[in-house]
């Protein structure tokens, strides 16, 4: 696709959806990741995203294509798939509340993520493509919350103040190389 833009549509603008998972374990307590933070991917998914990100940067710098990379931190919406922890939790909490389910199995409860609303992030993507010069941008809120905090709020929303009896930690859901903390710096 990048080669086609270079050869046949050099004025086209291209958006690459990169991911905060590219940063991996590259963090210190109370620090944020920005466009200059080194990548240390810890999964095949993150590694493939680093490859795609670097390809866009290379085509932009070498051939002048208008390719921008949005380094997206976790973005959520009501249509997010149930395979993602936030939707898994909200779906299970509703089912538990209505007596349709007894518990929920989760992996690492200590993981911290920078969660934002997908609709807001799409607006930022569009604004990126309106710029005169292509560049890379972190798309994030700058705040993190743990899975535990997410559980607290989700269960409290349905009037359950103690979620611990409903949550089972299952080693099967633990990632082999967990990224414990991601917080973006959206200042750019």
What label would you give each PLM region?
Residues 1-4, 153:
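Short, conserved SAM-binding segment of the class I
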Residues 3, 7-16, 21-71, 76-80:
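Catalytic helix-loop patch of NAD(P)-dependent Rossmann-fold dehydrogenases
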Residues 85-188:
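C-terminal substrate-binding subdomain of Rossmann-fold SDR/epimerase-dehydratase oxidoreductases
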């Amino acid at each position: 696709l990048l080669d086609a833009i270079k050869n046949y549509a050099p004025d086209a603008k291209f958006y690459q959806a990169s991911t905060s998972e590219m940063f991996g374990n590259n963090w210190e307590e109370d620090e944020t990741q920005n466009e200059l933070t080194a990548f240390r991917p810890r999964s095949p998914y993150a590694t493939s995203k680093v490859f795609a990100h670097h390809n866009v940067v290379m085509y932009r710098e070498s051939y002048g294509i208008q390719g921008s990379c949005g380094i997206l931190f976790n973005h959520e919406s009501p249509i997010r798939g149930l395979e993602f922890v936030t939707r898994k939790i909200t779906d299970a909490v509703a089912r538990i509340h209505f007596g349709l389910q007894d518990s929920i199995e989760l992996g690492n409860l200590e993981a911290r993520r920078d969660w934002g609303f997908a609709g807001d992030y799409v607006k930022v993507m569009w604004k990126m493509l309106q710029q005169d010069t292509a560049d890379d941008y972190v798309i994030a809120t700058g705040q993190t919350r743990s899975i535990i905090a997410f559980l607290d709020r989700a269960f409290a929303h349905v009037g359950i103040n103690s979620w611990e009896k409903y949550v089972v930690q299952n080693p099967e859901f633990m990632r082999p190389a967990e990224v414990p903390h991601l917080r973006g710096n959206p200042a750019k």
